[in-house]
């Protein structure tokens, strides 16, 4: 009995240590991101590591984490029934076994589809929700949200639910006055990164 208690305490200690270490890792990345004097180059995995798993999948996020990437960029779309999923395109055609616009599909129906890899081959992976993806990344990697600006009220509710506000980077290409007007209530809660188009002069 005494040995069992000791083992249980050891397991609890190890788990708590892992959680603290993971949180510290994210804070280190965040501090580097915010430090204008830092000479460290932060690595971003665009749509996750899509070379080893389908883009915008939890497997692609896991792979980026395993590679010790600093930030994973993911794209968000909204389903017919108002659920948030990971998908770059407005349609399902290119990256899944389905066809048509995402806005015409419910989450339940999308979950029946399979994701395709970079070569268009069908895999066993399914389309993840934003919540599933944030829980995969939680405490392990910073998350850059794309295509989230216009639906950020919905996005933020999930950030609160998953307690991942501290590791998310929101972005947009709008003028600063527009951002303050439309996004102002969130500017002290999440990081905001303006997209600068060097082609526009």
Question: Where are the regions a protein language model picked out?
Answer:
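Bacterial Sec-dependent N-terminal signal peptides
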Residues: 1-26
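Phosphate-group recognition and catalysis centered on beta-loop-alpha active-site segments
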Residues: 23-201
């Amino acid at each position: 009995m005494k040995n069992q208690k000791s083992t249980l305490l050891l397991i609890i200690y190890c788990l708590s240590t892992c959680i603290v270490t993971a949180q510290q890792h994210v804070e280190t990345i965040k501090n580097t991101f915010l430090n204008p004097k830092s000479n460290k180059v932060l690595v971003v995995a665009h749509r996750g590591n899509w070379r080893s798993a389908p883009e915008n999948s939890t497997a692609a996020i896991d792979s980026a984490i395993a590679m010790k990437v600093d930030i994973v960029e993911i794209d968000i779309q909204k389903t017919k029934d108002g659920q948030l999923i990971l998908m770059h395109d407005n349609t399902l055609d290119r990256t899944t076994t389905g066809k048509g616009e995402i806005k015409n599909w419910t989450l339940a129906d999308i979950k029946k589809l399979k994701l395709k890899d970079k070569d268009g081959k069908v895999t066993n992976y399914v389309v993840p929700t934003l919540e599933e993806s944030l829980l995969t990344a939680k405490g392990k990697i910073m998350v850059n949200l794309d295509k989230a600006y216009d639906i950020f009220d919905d996005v933020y509710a999930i950030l609160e639910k998953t307690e991942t506000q501290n590791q998310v980077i929101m972005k947009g290409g709008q003028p600063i006055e527009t951002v303050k007007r439309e996004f102002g209530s969130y500017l002290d809660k999440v990081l905001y990164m303006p997209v600068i188009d060097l082609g526009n002069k």
